[in-house]
């Protein structure tokens, strides 16, 4: 078989629309819990009928994750921007644990040496779940093994468990924390010192009052007291703060204090290992622990009344969360990939625009550019603030889609853009709430906004690629529990090439996110650089 490329007329602008969390559920038995199926989507219906479309892979080995693991927005945008399969950090860390190199990593052993010298305590902080979007529970198990290997016993290892419920079942936390405590008991080392939901500990939108609750819990023991982690979780399940905050994500500050004991908190001379490997939801709590008093005083958003920085605290992070953070990094980022989409387009002297709302802004900029903090030449970034007047987006499923659309239309009208990357967060962020009716409204809002961008782009002589980074809102009922499904899916996602030249011509099947950048370049009339292993989806198999 030979792959023959169908040459495209150069288009300007070429617009890549990422409908975040909009997947294709292949099983009709879930139609009544499929927001994409239930929504009124005249734009998507029209595009699918008139232009070539295909399903592409967004999970597992197709995006550099373990087989069967769902994709996520960070991984998805990095793969899209790279034009190649990107080996993800979860794989690097897991390999290091399996080959034992993790246990001799100098940053890891440095934490052990620090507490032995100071007489302090080792703390394990992280999202305790098997979602493998932000963390992997098995990496936490490895830290317990690390403590045992180095002679720590009992509460010389304190675990601060952040519960998930967003990338996992809303009530899976009890199982995950039980796995931790069982391993601690079998190993003779480790106790759970605190439990709190990711809604608080993993904020990324400068809602510092949430981070304050987590920080005060871990440093002062501030929160409701329970005799065990399981008791804390079960209590919240029975008494959520409100109906829209049901499940692990929203568990309030819980200090675990056995009868006759006292809270175990982070103190001077201690060491903290933060096991999360994804950076966007770790930065705020990390800065609270590590910024000196002067830096904390000037922190964006105002921070909170933290008090003085904890003295002599060894703080290590599984990966590099942000350039310049005053932490020890266990696994440094690999060298930057050359000739990613943004860099390659910039090298041609072309203008590009990236746009998303706050929730997905890092994804179309930082992650899309392989963890680069600054734009390339002729690369412009635009952000629409995500709504701050609601605590969960089911209360405002339209989010900031209209604001994003206006910014993109302005760029198209200006005539200066060669490439535009836009993310609509609604399908993913509202899908995470598990509220079907709201997810339907989210899909409908995105569909309407996409229609406006499509019309303006075609009128300007451009073309579009309409797709997603992963699925979510096409599965709103959990197949195992029958309750709300709040996590991503492993389903494929649609990709539509909206270009008059390709009407009636099939797209190549079996594609993945790595093929999107080459597809965009082909529409722009540019050669695909050799570093990109993805191929344009306008290639077809011939005899």
Curated annotation (Swiss-Prot):
Its EC number is 5.4.2.12. The active site is at residue 73. One of its GO terms (biological process) is glucose catabolic process. Its cofactor is Mn(2+). One of its GO terms (cellular component) is cytosol. This is 2,3-bisphosphoglycerate-independent phosphoglycerate mutase. PANTHER family: 2,3-BISPHOSPHOGLYCERATE-INDEPENDENT PHOSPHOGLYCERATE MUTASE (PTHR31637:SF0). Pathway: Carbohydrate degradation; glycolysis; pyruvate from D-glyceraldehyde 3-phosphate: step 3/5. Pfam families: iPGM_N, Metalloenzyme. The gene is gpmI. It comes from Rhodopirellula baltica (strain DSM 10527 / NCIMB 13988 / SH1). Substrate binds at residues 134, 166-167, 198, 204, 278-281, 360. The keyword Lyase does not apply. Belongs to the BPG-independent phosphoglycerate mutase family. Mn(2+) 1 binds at residues 428, 432, 488. Monomer. One of its GO terms (molecular function) is manganese ion binding. It catalyses: (2R)-2-phosphoglycerate = (2R)-3-phosphoglycerate. Binds 2 manganese ions per subunit. InterPro entries: Alkaline_phosphatase_core_sf, BPG-indep_PGM_N, Metalloenzyme, PGAM_B_sf, Pgm_bpd_ind. NCBIfam families: pgm_bpd_ind (TIGR01307). It is an enzyme of class 5 (isomerase).
